[in-house]
Amino acid sequence: MPNAVRYTIEVAPSASADFRFVHLTDTHIMAGGRWRPRAGDFEFDTEASLRRVIETVRALDPVPAFAVFGGDLASPDLLDRGRALTAEEYEPSYRLLAEIVAGLPCPAHFLVGNHDHRVAFNRVLRPKAPAPDAPQYYSFDHARYHFVVLDSQEPGQAAGLLDATQLRWLRTDLAEHARQPTLVFVHHHPWPLGLEWIDSMSLRNGDALMAALGEHPDVRWVICGHVHLDQASQRGRLTMLTTPSTCIQLSKVTQAPKMLPGPPAFRIVDVAGEQLSTRVIHLHGAAGRDV
């Protein structure tokens, strides 16, 4: 049975039906290749690990109402670090991702991360995007809960940024959904985790995001990817959760980058009455091998 770590908080009373969703992140799909990280003496099959995660999600009872993919969806750039890849070179990885995700028993929502290519992402996963390189931010409701998907990609940078237009949209959206329990998804973590080399790649204007969220007491959780770690921290009434990757993980006991060959993982969030609870599922027996 996979290992699970649970973290629970109370939210405002709800008359809505119980439901669950899953957060999967940093899938790093690279069609036709295996990830061989610089900070690790191994190679890893990110496709195989994601397929294992999807099979585990398919077996969940109850079935999730939806899945959220937290960014860094496709990463063929990690196979060819010497140059910037074109949209056409990214597209096979997004098509492979789409084929794998089609096995889910529920709808999927997608965030953009720093390794993603917006044009290729939009062509494959968001064909009705208003422009070829349009950012991916929006909100949706399920039961009486409100969910916000943000786009923190700053092209060409490992760190993230929310531009003024997106922050204005966020404030308007939250104001229009006041008194709804709200969860926010963003790829980059908005406040430090305490590891300098990871925090150097965080959301550069995290304080601006926190200021916007702080105006709305019904915003409870911010759920992030990017760091390949299972972390939970609190600032005032806001809880930030980071979800491990569906493939390679990062060590949180070193002050320099160190990558580990799994185990693949994902997060379950259960909504039951007045309570939100979450746990991270780790799938042992990773799809990596020494080289």
Language-model features, listed with the residues they occupy:
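N-terminal active-site segment of His-dependent metallophosphoesterases
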Residues: 1-90, 193
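Extended active-site neighborhood of metal-dependent phosphoesterases/phosphodiesterases
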Residues: 5-13, 40, 83-181, 203-218, ...
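Structural motif
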Residues: 19-21, 66, 145-147, 181-183, ...
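Generic enzyme active-site microenvironment
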Residues: 24, 69-71, 111, 185, ...
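Active-site environment of divalent metal-dependent phosphoester hydrolases
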Residues: 28-35, 75-78, 110-121, 155-158, ...
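Short acidic, glycine-rich surface-loop motifs adjacent to enzyme active sites
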Residues: 66, 177-193
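A contiguous binding-surface segment within folded domains or other stable secondary-structure elements
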Residues: 195-200, 208
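Short, solvent-exposed aromatic-acidic interface loops
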Residues: 278-290
